[in-house]
Design a protein with these regions (language model features):
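Short, polar/charged alpha-helical segment
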Residues: 4, 33-37, 54-73, 169, ...
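Long, aromatic- and glycine/proline-rich binding clefts that accommodate carbohydrate-like moieties
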Residues: 21-40, 45, 317-324, 370-422, ...
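Short, solvent-exposed loop/beta-turn-alpha elements that line the ligand-binding surface or hinge
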Residues: 18, 25, 35-41, 122-137, ...
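Extracytoplasmic/periplasmic substrate-recognition and gating elements
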Residues: 64, 69, 145-150, 169-170, ...
């Protein structure tokens, strides 16, 4: 009797007793995602590492909501983009447990999964229905490795890509419109091609007025100039490798060379002064300061540009997608990150991290995430009229996410990136050599790395 009584109490307390003895019916994904188990004993807080930027602030607000609901404190620890990767991989090489989760760059998937840093989330994302709540492209880019394997290491958290902001008051000024048409023979409007982008950039470059055509990425740290250049490269028909992962003849193809020459021409003719080492902060600052007519940036940084307390031109700021290249191709560099669980933390902490992601992935919380300014990957939220009309840049974002491409995400991506950052910077900013020579060196070094690493098929 005593055994029966104690067993009955344990089973009831643990929620294992089913009403009427019947098996519980299968529940839809949203219902499965919203049923949070009690937190593992002793887990009072969770630590999430991310880069230092506005979306991390928004995630902290989401974390505060979680604390109100569960009592578990969520700390979003922010590290500047330039040192974010170094900090993370140094911690991982020591199998550190300072962080329970990381909102890691899409390019980290190969290295972090192959080296055992990330927890395999395939069963978790599948059994909860979370896998089916996000768009397929974001699941592929932010969660899956190897490509096409159906193995998932991250929850798509911050969808992102490069786009452009422009000064509507300049573009729509009747005098400017007349002068532009007189000079170039077509109407002044957001550019649809890189040739038009160059024309418009030249037209608005007026040093005597402290006005310049563009602010584009040039920074040597992390992946800035590589991301900026690949916006042009992909749209010009270039790529980092062919289907067999051969870089030679692809990175240094005529299409890629033409794209790099265009990127340097934009820098030489029309870049605002002081932007020889520019990334997202500097391009936004140049726009806010009234220095440029057009500014390249990730969509994640555009909320500041529509905030009149930050940007004096907020009411006159418009947005357009990355233009087409000469052959009609149109792509944009992928940004964005997925949320992954660190494999070195205890099983209890891993479960607590899963509980947080399960809660975060609910449609209602993803709607909150989007409302704060996070770029949700949730299919329902992205398709909602509420999202598309919530911000002036959201329609361009939704369009851009249909033609994104990314840099490498294989385990040696960091070595490949260092080569491209160095060579592109030396040519575009440093003025060393020709575009062909710069891309020849990248192609040669990349080819050797890919062959030595066994990645060439």
């Amino acid at each position: 009797d005593r055994i029966a009584e104690e067993h009955q109490k344990m089973l009831e307390d643990g929620g294992f007793v089913k009403e009427g003895g019947a098996m519980a019916e299968e529940k839809p994904a949203e219902a499965m995602m919203s049923e949070l188990p009690p937190p593992p004993e002793g887990i009072k807080e969770l630590n999430i590492l991310w880069a230092q930027w506005d979306p991390a602030d928004y995630l902290q607000e989401i974390g505060n909501m979680y604390e109100q609901e569960t009592g578990i404190k969520v700390n979003v620890i922010q590290e500047p983009w330039g040192s974010f990767g170094d900090l993370f991989f140094t911690e991982m090489s020591a199998q550190g447990t300072s962080y329970d989760m990381v909102v890691g760059d899409s390019q980290w998937l190969g290295q972090s999964s192959s080296q055992g840093h990330y927890l395999d989330m395939t069963d978790f994302l599948t059994s909860t229905g979370i896998k089916d709540s996000v768009t397929p492209a974001t699941l592929q880019y932010y969660g899956e490795y190897p490509p096409g394997s159906g193995t998932y290491w991250g929850y798509p958290t911050e969808g992102d890509a490069d786009g452009w902001a422009y000064r509507k008051d300049l573009f729509e000024n009747p005098d400017e419109m007349a002068a532009f048409k007189d000079k170039y023979g077509y109407d002044l409007a957001p550019p649809e091609t890189y040739a038009q982008l160059k024309d418009i950039a030249e037209f608005f470059t007026r040093p005597e007025e402290n006005l310049y055509g563009v602010a584009i990425y040039t920074q040597a740290d992390y992946d800035a100039i590589t991301m900026g250049f690949e916006n042009a490269m992909f749209s010009f028909g270039g790529n980092w490798a062919d289907a067999g992962n051969n870089a030679m003849g692809v990175v240094n193809s005529p299409e890629s060379v033409a794209a790099l020459e265009m990127y340097k021409e934009l820098y030489d003719c029309c870049q605002a002064p002081g932007l020889s080492n520019a990334f997202f902060v500097e391009t936004n600052d140049a726009f806010i300061g009234g220095q440029v007519a057009m500014s390249m940036n990730y969509f994640a940084f555009f909320p500041a540009l529509v905030n009149p307390e930050v940007n004096p031109y907020a009411a006159d700021t418009g947005f357009f997608v990355n233009p087409k290249g000469p052959g009609g191709d149109q792509y944009a560099a992928l940004g964005g990150q997925g949320m992954s669980i660190i494999s070195y933390i205890s099983p209890d902490r891993q479960q607590a991290a899963k509980d947080f992601i399960k809660w975060f992935a609910q449609d209602s919380i993803q709607q909150e995430w989007a409302a704060l300014g996070g770029y949700t990957c949730n299919s329902k939220v992205l398709q909602s009229e509420e999202f598309l009309s919530a911000a002036p840049f959201n329609p361009a974002f939704a369009e851009t996410m249909t033609f994104v491409k990314d840099f490498w995400n294989i385990p040696i991506y960091g070595e490949l990136l260092r080569v491209s950052q160095t060579e592109l910077g030396n040519y575009v900013v440093g003025g060393q050599g020709t575009a062909q020579e710069a891309l020849d060196r990248i192609a040669e070094e990349h080819q050797k790395m890919l062959e030595d690493g066994g990645f060439v098929k």
